[in-house]
Structures are given as C-alpha cells and as structure tokens.
Amino acid sequence: MPSFQRVLSLILLGGLAAGCVSGVDSGRYGIEAVGRQIDVCHGYSCKYRSKLTLGAADTRRFASILAAGQKSPQAERAAIARAVSYFESRTRAVTGVRDEPQSKFGASGVRGQMDCVDESTNTRALLLYLEKRRLLRHHTVARNASRGFFLDGRYLHNTAVIRDARGVKWAVDSWYAPMGGAPDILPLSQWMPRGFLSSGALN
C-alpha cells in the first residue's frame, strides 16, 4: 500500500498542475477599481500588479453590454459573462501576454499568466467597477469563495461571486477559459462540490 506521504505528494502535484498554485484567499488583496483604474493581478497569487486604465470608451462599452441584461437576472448573468470577456481582452494591453486557460505547471512567476487567485481577484475588481457605476440591476458583488484543500481530494480553487435578489450566490469563474473567453457562471452551491482530482480536476 502506498505510504501516506507518497499519496499526499501525488495529490499535491496533481493539484498544482490543474488547480491553483496557492491557497491564498483572493479576497485578502482588496483590489478594487479606483476611479478609472484597476490593478490587474498576474504572475500567480497576485505576484505582479499592472494598472489598467478604463477610459470613456470602455465605460460606454460596459454600459452597452450590461444594458442587454436588464430584463432579468438570467440575462444579466449572460451580460456579465460578456463584460468579463471584454475586460480580459483589455487586460492584455497591460500584461502584454495572452493568459492560457487554467493554471500551467511551472508558470508561477511568469508575467501575464494567471492562476485562480489572479483570475478571481481581477474578476471581482471588474464586478465592483460595474457595481459602482450602477450597471448591475439584478445582482450585487459578494466576497470571493474558495473550495478544496488537497486532503479532501480536490485542488485549491477560488472564484468571484455575485448574489441575486433572492439571495442566491453565483460563481463567476474565469479560470477555465483562455483570456477573453466566457467565464463559467453557475450557482455557488453547484460550484463548491466540484474539482475532484479523480474526475480530472477540470470539471
């Protein structure tokens, strides 16, 4: 029978390859949009921060995107997904690199590459930017959420979170898609149990 240490090592290696490099709470960074600027985290666990200035054209673009979601919470979540995609395409202007999907083993410390701490922190900063401009009608921004701690068979993973008028929380997880791709938006209650290494760690 494999030793406990060997099993733990395999779990840790699998988690590092498929999930977050760090178990740091992404909410601790406190990054928000200050005026028209957002500090974009990258390099894994927010090692680097690059300032992105969102101008008047960006504000109009976000307003147009979110206007399409005013009819219902479901429509707004779809609009939020499009807003995240646009925001990520803008972040490339300051990182200079197109972030690959998920976390690549060995990419820690590489400028422009993002783990789930970077992704969830950046997404929350955007959501707060939208909220401050009253572009969100059906949702408010909640604290980021985390799941997994290796010993339960899951890799560490973080996500941004929104809450609808009924109090239901929704994960806004941009980690799985490449930069500019649509984030996964699903009930947080469904997001929390996912991420078992036995299933490939990519569900």
Question: Where are the regions that the model predicts?
Answer:
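Low-complexity, Gly/Ser/Thr/Pro-rich intrinsically disordered linker/tail segments
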Residues: 192-203
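Acidic/histidine-rich, surface-exposed loop or edge segments in extracytoplasmic proteins
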Residues: 41-47, 52-71, 97-109
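Bacterial N-terminal signal peptides that target proteins for export
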Residues: 1-9
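Mid-length scaffold segments of soluble, non-membrane domains
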Residues: 79-139
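Hydrophobic/aromatic-rich core segments of domains that either
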Residues: 128-191
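Bacterial signal peptide processing site
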Residues: 21-24
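Bacterial N-terminal signal peptides
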Residues: 9-18
